[in-house]
Structure formats: structure tokens, C-alpha cells
Amino acid sequence: MSSGQSFSRSLLKLPLSVMVKGTTIPSNPIDDLNIDLTKPIVYALPFRSNVDLLTLQKQAMSLGLPDPLSPLEINGKTLNRFVFIASRPTVMGNDNDIPTDSVSLFTELLELHKLDSELDVQMIPATVLWGRKPGKEESHRPYLQPMNGPQKAKAVMAAGRDCLVRFSPVVSLRYMADSHGTDSAIAHKLARVARIHFSRQKLAASGPNLPQRQVLFARLLKSPAIEQAIEDEAKSKDISIEKARKEAHDIMDEIAADFSYGLVKNGDRILSWLWTKLYQGLHINNASTVRRLAQDGHEIVYVPCHRSHMDYLLLSYVLYHEGMVPPHIAAGINLNFFPAGPIFRRGGAFFIRRSFKGNKLYSTIFREYLAELFAKGYSVEYFSEGGRSRTGRLLQAKTGMLAMTIQAMLRGLNRPVTLVPVYIGYEHVMEVGTYAKELRGKRKEKENAGLVLRTLRKLRNFGLGYVNFGEPIQLNQYLNEHAPEWTKDIDSMGGSKPQWMNPVVNELANKMMTHINDAAAANALTLCATALLASRQRALSRDSLINQIECYLKLLKNNPYSSTSTIPTESAEELVDHAISLDKFVIETDSMGDIISLDRSQSILMTYYRNNIIHLFALPSLIAQMIIRQRNLTVEKIQENVAQIYPFLKKELFLSYQEEDLNDLVVKTLNEFAEQKMICLDGNKLEINQSNNQPLVLLGRTITETLQRYSIAMNLLVAYPELGKSDLEQKSQDIAQRLGRLHGINAPEFFDKGVFTAMFNTLKQQEYLDSDGNCDKKKTQKFAKLLFTLLYPEVKLTIEESIHQLQA
């Protein structure tokens, strides 16, 4: 290092320490990027810059990484630990050539690998981004630009508190040397590849250049599809082309986002304060997978579950803090009220009407706008359920936006399109009380400013929030597998709907929802709610509750539901203490200790949180209930019974297990029960351990309400095999409501007609009903008999009496 460089860096350190507050992506690069600290490390930066180097130094050392300014010793040679891929421009001109000293360092490092077969230098590309404002569409400048001295000083002053230091996956120089050789040409190639990589990093962090809104409208109005729709509108309404075009412009103005980086940047500060006030922390998982997709140039479509209006803000906030661009979000037109509407719009929301069936002009404009977002490379987010879940369960997907996504691909997109399922979980959903009222028949209140103000008054500590990114679904690959000749239907005009579209979209929607549930996050409140609701009086002693949570944790840890689901790291006792601190339970103390219970209103609210994770326990709960209710069971009999019931659970709860894996899963679950000493397993036979049967009983009760619903429908079919779809759904709902009143079942979804509708579809798929709705009575009787064996006698009696009264 020259003395001049050393002096200038020492001068810069003090002002930079005051003016720069960097954020690192990822926050824990050593673990997230699998950096091996026992191997030599070299940092690669895009441009020669002492400011960037010193900023990197501060962040690297705070993370436990080597100091970029410390010398690198390899086999007796002392080398720089950093390399610049391009020179720094000056006010007199720009020199983008790769610096000679950088090429020399690359060449020397590659040569050292040639001489030492054990050597493996890790190169870590690192980008220092000063602000993340996207460019303007009319600009032809590159995404990542070098800055001269005055420009860099201005950037530090303007964006020093918004500085992002982004570490990329390690590049093994051992691999480069072995695969490509060690001469200077390879060193040049390595530098060129790094330059492309840095440009992609900037694009992933800032997003594509933004158009002016009116320029976008003008471009859309010239699209052949919209021009044709305007002509058709003019003819059908007998109005002038100018008036129809004005209508089209008004629709665009209603729909289109007006993204503002300034609002996002300032909004981030407000949201950081808000999350700190509301939540004790946010847990984010698997974000690195999404970052890789963004950096590799994928068109990303986020498809989160929808629990709360908070979802809009939370996911954008998390993505921004994970170094990615907040997406353009499809929001219901009901949210376009003052002042929320304009704020959401400038934060990236575009608004969609609840229904636009029969409105060709609107549907064409919306489809063209969505295709434009995809074509320009903006990430998009839409809620696949169509609205917020009032029960806490994942709803059946609305497929309209998914179909339009595939239609956009049929326009000839030149980038891969990938769905990213997102599970969002909370320990408190602020609308949950409203949901319970709506499910009891109260009319939904229209969103307005007054509602927002009333909600803000309720803000308090809501515990923890969770954002888990699920396994991505690459649509190009999916279409190649399920519609191999889909590329033949590519049409630049758009709007085509090939015959394969509907079945493929329906299958894709089910896969998407399954991947969302796969990424579920169990937490203190959902686990405690599950346990308390399984007890007969909605009450457990503190010790029993801790014991039950311990049972759940072992099940989830030893037999993980999926690779993307998460479980708490705290002990059962710590989780119970945390759940109690959320002030949702009744705590009473007697001479033997604390009793934790739910009153009636709390029981209804707690079903929401239980339903968030009920799918995680569906199979273990079903097996437990069989063991509790059926005697002299063998492993084979359990496997047979599970195979009969599982298709209904799979459809209703979006379970990911494949039918061919069920037998192995049953064995693994039984082994875990035995390990927890809930049962004694002797080869093919098993029996309950009576000295430790409470965890098994509580586990089994979690699924009983679902089995009761199935039993109602199946026994109705046995009694009335000629029942049609609507009659079966209505009578099932009537009996479920009666059962709920007589047996204190508070779960709102217990008599939800939509759940019976989903079951009716499964009855057809499993051939209990043929295509004309005729019942296979023998098969239905067998299933109804099995379900009855899993119910408690008093519930079974109520179902029999209710069906008998209908017959009378």
C-alpha cells in the first residue's frame, strides 16, 4: 500500500465513522454464505474507492470477517486482501478498464493455486451501495456506475445512513484454477464476470428503471390489445373513440402504481419505529434463496398467505431490509381510500377490482398492465387467497391472477418467472376480533380513515412476527412438465387462453398453497392455543401445558414437517412464559400451582392461531386419535385407516405428504410416540402407556372437529345417497351448527360451508361419488363407519339423532 493511499484512508476514517451507518446483506454472511474462516479470503469490489473500502472494512470486522486492509500471507508471499474490478473515474474522465494491479493480483493468486494443490482462496464479491434509488426509464446509463470524488462525497452525505454493504456467495479460486487454468486471460475473464455480477447486484437491490406514469399510459394505449378493446367499447356503448380512450385512461389511473423511492426510504424509518413498537422481533427465514433468484435475473412473483392488512407493509419492509426491491402489490380497490390509497400507491400498490367479469376494457387493461410489469422486470406480489383468512386457515386459491401471470408468459417473456410462496405469521393479528364477529354474521365494515384511526388506538406489543419464504416454483420448468408444448401458444398480442390453461393453473394453485403451508412457523402462541383448545375445559395446569408443548416440539423437531417450516428454539417453559406475557389467557392459582385457561371469547379467538399451524399436526393427531379411540390396533391397520382419511385432510389443509410415503410416515410417527413414552411399541402391536397418556389424548383431540365434519357428511350420504351437492353442503352445515351448540365447539370454521364444498370435491376425486353425483354406497358406508370409531360417544349420538330427525 502506498503511503499516499494510507494517509488518505486515515483522513477519511473519522468523517465516515460519523456519516455512514451501513447495513449488511446478509446479516450473518459467515453462516449464510458458508464462508470458511480457515481458508484465505480476498474481497472484490466493483470500483477503486477508498470510501467503499473503509466502509467494507468496518462492516467486515464487525461480522467477524478478516480486515480487508490486513495483508494476506500465502506461502511466504504478502498480497493485498482486496481487489478492485474497475478504476475510479475522475472529474476529467472515466476509465472503466480493469486496473493492472488487480489483474496482477488475480494472476498471482491463480498461479499460487497451480503451485499448491491444497490452496483454496475464497473470493468474496462485496458491493457498497449508496442509496437504492432506481433510475429513470429514459436513462441509458448502466445500473451500476462508478463515481468520481465529488459524486462520491455527495452520495455519502445524501445516503450515508442508507448505505448497503452486500456480500455475495464465495467464489473458489481453486475451482477457477482447476476448471479454467491460471493465465492472465483467465484473470481478465474473472474480472469481467465479476463486473456483470456487481451490476446484477445493483439491479436486485434497486430494481429496474422507473417510467413516468403518463409515458407508461401512452405506451399502454398504443398496445394492439387495448386499442382493440377501446374500439369494442366504443361500439358496444355507442360512444366516440375519444370518450372510450378517456375511459381507458381513467381505468389505468385507477389501477397503476406510482412507485416513489423517497416514500419507501422515509416509510422505512416510520415502519422501523412501528415494528419496534408493535413487535418484540421479526423472524425471517430463507431470504437468501430469494436474493439468489433476484440476482440471477428471475421475474419474481411473491404469493403470500393473507392474515392481516399488515401483510402489505410487512413483506415490503422485510424485502427492503433483505436488500431487495419492494414489489408492486396487487391490492383490493377497497384500500384505495384517503389517505391510505395514495400512500400505498406510491409504495408500489396497484389496485384491482373485486370482480371485472364482463368488463372487457377493464380486464384487457389490467392484463396489459400486469404484462408490462413483468416485461420491465418489476417484482410483483399478490395474495392468492383473494382476501384475508377469517379463520386462520389457508383458503382455497383464487386463480385469476395466476392465470394472468401465465398469460403474461405467453407474451414471450425472455426471463424465467418464479413464484415465491411466503408464509406470514403473527402472535397477534389486530383484526382477529373483527374476524370472529364477521364469522358470526356481522357485516364487514368498509375500510376507511376512521377504521384506520380506531385500529391505531389499539396498537400495543404484539409479540413476534414471522416471514418464512417457501420453496420457489419456477413456472417455465413447471409448464415444461405439465404443458410440454406451451411455447407453441406464445402470442405477442396476449389474451390467449389455451385449452391446457385451466387444469394447469388449478394444479399449480394447489402446489403454490401447499408450499405456503410447508413454510409454516410454529410459535409460542400457536402452540399454546393448540394445547389449550384440545383440553375439554379449555384449561390446563402450567405443568401439563409445558409438558404438551414439549411433546409438540419433539414431534416437529424429530419428524420435521418440511425443509422450509420453522420451530422455536426456546424451551417449552420459556415458550409458555412468553405466551402468558401476551395477556391472552386467564391465569388462576391454587395450592398446587397455576391453571391456565381460556374464557369463551378467548377460545373463539384462539382457534385462529391454532388454525395457522393445525396442518403441522394433522397426521400425528390423526394417528393419536386412532390409538385413543380404537382398540387392538396394529401398525398395518393404522396405515390402512390413515390412507383412507388422508386425501380429505390433504385437500382441506394443503398437506404436502405424498400418498406413497404415508406408510413410512406412520412408522416414524409411532416411533416418536414410543420415544416420548406415550405408547409401547412391540413389533406390529402397540398399546397406550397409561402413565403418560395425557399428551396423546390432547394431540388426538386437535383433529377431532375435522373428523366430526367428515362424519356428518359421510353419514348423511349413507342416509341420503341421492343428495345433491348443494343439499349435502346445506344439511351438513345445519348439523354441524347443531353439534357446535350442543357440545361447545367454538371454532368458526366448524360449520363453514366452504369447508364442506372442498370436501364434496374430494368425494368425487376419491370416487365416493361419480361424475353425475351418484353415491357408491358400500364404499361410503365403510368410510362412515371408520369415522364413527374415531369420535367420542356423545358426539356420535348427536350426529345419529340429527340425521334421524332429518329423516323423520
UniProtKB/Swiss-Prot annotation:
It is a peripheral membrane protein. InterPro entries: GPAT/DHAPAT, GPAT/DHAPAT_C, GPAT/DHAPAT_LPLAT, GPAT_PlsB, Plipid/glycerol_acylTrfase. Pathway: Phospholipid metabolism; CDP-diacylglycerol biosynthesis; CDP-diacylglycerol from sn-glycerol 3-phosphate: step 1/3. One of its GO terms (molecular function) is glycerol-3-phosphate O-acyltransferase activity. Its EC number is 2.3.1.15. The keyword Acyltransferase applies. It is found in: Cell inner membrane. It is an enzyme of class 2 (transferase). It comes from the Bacteria. It catalyses: sn-glycerol 3-phosphate + an acyl-CoA = a 1-acyl-sn-glycero-3-phosphate + CoA. SUPFAM superfamilies: Glycerol-3-phosphate (1)-acyltransferase. A motif (HXXXXD motif) lies at residues 306-311. One of its GO terms (biological process) is CDP-diacylglycerol biosynthetic process. Transmembrane segments: none annotated. One of its GO terms (cellular component) is plasma membrane. Keywords: Acyltransferase, Cell inner membrane, Cell membrane, Lipid biosynthesis, Lipid metabolism, Membrane, Phospholipid biosynthesis, Phospholipid metabolism, Transferase. The HXXXXD motif is essential for acyltransferase activity and may constitute the binding site for the phosphate moiety of the glycerol-3-phosphate. NCBIfam families: plsB, PRK04974.1. Belongs to the GPAT/DAPAT family. PANTHER family: DIHYDROXYACETONE PHOSPHATE ACYLTRANSFERASE, GLYCEROL-3-PHOSPHATE ACYLTRANSFERASE. This is Glycerol-3-phosphate acyltransferase. The gene is plsB.
